Amino acid sequence: MTIRPARAHDFPGFLGLAAQVEQWFGPMVEVPGFHDAVREHIDGRDGHAALVAPSSSGPGLLGGMLFGTRGPTYHVHWLVVSGRARGTGVGRALVEEAVRRWVRYPGEIEVVTFGPDHPGADVSGARVFYERLGFAPAEAAAPGPEGGSRQVFRRTVDRRQGIG
């Protein structure tokens, strides 16, 4: 599997991934602010970066990640794995590559994901995914745009280390 920095031509792939998860996260594909955020991360502006797992069997992306590269608190801003690639290690590989490229210790990595009562929490597997990567549930976060609960997950980085 290849993980690489996103390029401008990957933008439609990010929209394709977003379309697969709008039922959990709310509208993104038609939202100009989402488009701007993806482009800002692809361009690597202001402490932002984007990684992708391109499909080897055709167009589109197996996964994509938007990441905040400024420490000591780093942020997974957005991470989606295509439905056809979930459970195959794509998400883990994206996080591992972000850690390898940008995370320095001491520090921490934060992500906001579904709260425990959100309908997407079990179906998506997001909470379990982050826990398996060494993140721990922390404080509640503001509700998502669709009104569902959110929670911060945090992982302390106390030395140069890989994921789980």
Residue ranges: model-predicted function:
Residues 68, 112, 138-141:
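Solvent-exposed beta-strand sheet faces enriched in polar/charged residues
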Residues 72, 144-149:
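Short acidic/glycine-enriched loop/turn segments that link adjacent beta-strands
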